[in-house]
């Protein structure tokens, strides 16, 4: 091919160039739509005073809201001292603790349940799978009254998972595993049975084949389930606000509502706490992002 022919081949039709420009424009608009709220929240947290309105770039940078969120008192020019209104860092720790334990528990339960559905034959398997998925479709808000009565009664016999306990919140969160069971089951069914059969011929028990053969091959989907469970637990409000009554036991998602008192909206403090709440989610996502795409795509394959 001559140089002129190569140049002609590289020239794109006008319609294709317009389509490409339109795609890039829509992508930039989508990115701006995502970034603008985040930048606005950061700007509110850096403005003096507790105001929700103002420019995207503050005229004056103030760290008072961040100091209060981090548990430090703020000394003003007139000598007055403002103590932290709420234990934000304690709430953040409560959120991380509950989310981590919940995510690990959901991964463990979902994996073992999915293995049974994917590899074992038993009566009523299909009906049980469909029933789990149907019950998962109902929003948690519909079961709040039942959850309160249930954990009130359970707490009389096992106080560590009753009302106003983190154990109770974790126990409630771990009930929503149906969708994760379906996802992991679909991933397991993409893995050839011959690998486990070969391990069985070498003397491995079913548990050893599951633990040493199947689980290492399933790390991508397990990472996806862990991330989704972690995000759901750390951002959940209705169930946590129902079960937790003590201020010091709040999660950050529940405690942040205290800033929005009808008599005094502390927008700056609220914004600083909101940015802090995004740090654990971002950290977990960055640590597990290399497994995320592969796990999501393979987990959706029908076996």
UniProtKB/Swiss-Prot annotation:
Domain ABC transmembrane type-1 intervals: 92-288
Subcellular location, record wording: Cell inner membrane
Periplasmic side stretches: 43-95, 151-159, 235-265
Keyword Ribonucleoprotein: no
InterPro entries per UniProt: BP-dep_ABC_trans_perm, MetI-like, MetI-like_sf
Coiled coil ranges: none
GO biological process: maltodextrin transmembrane transport; maltose transport
Residues in compartment: Cytoplasmic: 1-19, 119-130, 183-211, 289-303
Domain of life where this protein originates: Bacteria
Membrane topology: Multi-pass membrane protein
Keywords: Cell inner membrane, Cell membrane, Membrane, Sugar transport, Transmembrane, Transmembrane helix, Transport
GO molecular function: ABC-type maltose transporter activity
Residues spanning the membrane: 20-42, 96-118, 131-150, 160-182, 212-234, 266-288
GO CC annotations, alphabetized: plasma membrane
PANTHER family the record matches: MALTOSE TRANSPORT SYSTEM PERMEASE-RELATED, MALTOSE_MALTODEXTRIN TRANSPORT SYSTEM PERMEASE PROTEIN MALG
Similarity field: Belongs to the binding-protein-dependent transport system permease family. MalFG subfamily.
Task of the protein: Part of the ABC transporter complex MalEFGK involved in maltose/maltodextrin import. Probably responsible for the translocation of the substrate across the membrane.
Subunit: The complex is composed of two ATP-binding proteins (MalK), two transmembrane proteins (MalG and MalF) and a solute-binding protein (MalE).
The protein, known as: Maltose/maltodextrin transport system permease protein MalG
